[in-house]
Amino acid sequence: MKNKLLIFSILILCTSSCNYLEYDESDFLEKDAVFSSFQYTRDFLTNIYSYVPAAFGTIGGDALRSAACDEAVYVDKLSPVHSFNNGAWSAINTLDDRWNYFRGIRAVNMFLQEVEGQEFDELKHNEDYEDIMAQFKYYPYEARFLRAYFYFELAKRYGDIPLITTLLSEEEANMQKRTSFDEVIQFIVDECDAIAPHLPISYKELIKSETGRATRGAAMALKSRALLYSTSPLFNKSGNIDKWKSAARAAADVIEKAWDFGYMPLPDLWSLWNNNYSNNNELIFGVMQREDNWFERVNFPIGIEGGGNTGHCPTENLVESYEMQASGLPVAPDAGYEHMDPSYNSQNPYEGRDPRMYELVAQNGAWWVYDEQVECWYGGRSGKPQKNATVTGYYLRKYVDGSTSLKSEFVTSKRHVWNIMRYSEILLNFAEAMVEAYGDPNYKDGYPMSAKEAVDIVRSRVHVDMPPFPNNLTLNEFKAKLRNERRVELSFEDHRFWDIRRWKIADQTTDIYGVDITKKEDGSFSYKKVLVEKRIFKDCMYLYPIPQSERYINPELEQNPGW
């Protein structure tokens, strides 16, 4: 953690939707000059926002953490993400290294120290001074939210971490010991409680040109997520029921404010990630990308006009988790609970499934852009043995904007919204915490709804229309089906990678399956489930290793067990 106190290099780049800070070594400003200027102070805070990942934690440039769990296989065999799966990562060969969040934390600590009592005297005679100060009053609370978010991202990876809330010298910072995971989570919870009342419900009427900033709901949602993780088996080894109750209460607090905050499950799933941020009533906290076609270039299927590089291939493991729509019953015994739908036909596997599956994958025969069909069968234009063909029999559709053109004569770009927290997650957080705390899916004394009612809201929204959970499920069946619902609803949103760790089931997810598809002489297809990868997972991998480079700098950092 470097200590750079005196100079800042600032280059301001403004767009219609947001403000950025970029550093340029040709321009230098002393610290006092930065924090005596409202413009530079605002840009300093905006730069702290840049530490929030704009895409779900890309590894090696393009791969998502979905390819490091049982959601996907990444087709490029040279991608570093494969080291997650073959056990070739270590404290020296780190992957997804987020220790640099401490830079963001240090920036927050500096920001809070320097802006305290600031009134920007040189602007007091400006006509817009009151508007400026109305914006500025939120800045310290936004910064504290970001610090809490960074600490959560660190804690879920590394467990115990240094907890630093003041600006330290370089020597002091490099002698900090690790604080227990529970203490870090309690700090996050306390911060969220303290800052939430001071943050606005929305910025739409306050600062119309800026979106993606921390709100009251974002602070409350972060508390919900932090408590859910802390009470899960990985971190709650004693099974403390009171922790589950606290997690349920935190999620309930968001649900009870949903109407006031304007949150609701969005019926148009496509709009969750390919729409204007301000029109997304389900989104609680996220990042809007500039217009580009990077994700499409990485993930468009091969073989179609203007095709891409295939990228992420959803697994048969994930596809099997999508139930039959009419019955709500699974198509495989490990997809929820054992009562399978007898009408499911493994040789016509994609008919009548959960509508969310069609938003996730492009399966064999699916229509793609330009009125072309995806041909995943052996010998098809999108299938083996074509170079970069899908290795699982599926292509990724989620987040891919089908209206984007990659044709050489007409290349277009689109905006993407990366959902970091959304309302359906809160409903699922609540359902999980409630059923673990009270052992009854229908219990709701003192709460806005029961676990069953919460999950049924997610399933019953327009354009999903999945049947409610059956009333006759055993407790264990309900829990299994609920975990499957979370897997389905939040697929490719950077949850599954962490869920299988906090539930301590990652060692059960190492067999990765796809389908081999053969086209018959009569034009029909046969489908065969096949093992694609057998991955490696050791107990030490439930937590990341502390980067050895940081331990050389700070000898007080003890390594996580097994690394």
Regions found by a protein language model. Give the residues of each.
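Flexible, polar/acidic helix-loop-strand segments at domain edges
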Residues: P342-Y423
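Bacterial Sec-dependent N-terminal signal peptides
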Residues: M1-D27
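Conserved, well-structured interaction surfaces
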Residues: S37, R42-T46, S50-A54, D76-Y158, ...
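Long, intrinsically disordered, low-complexity segments
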Residues: S17-Y20, R98-G104, F187, S271-V331, ...
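Short coil/turn linking the two alpha-helices of tandem helical-hairpin repeats
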Residues: E153-R157, P162, Y203, Y229-S238, ...
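Membrane-proximal, proline-rich intrinsically disordered regions
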Residues: C18-R65, R551-W563
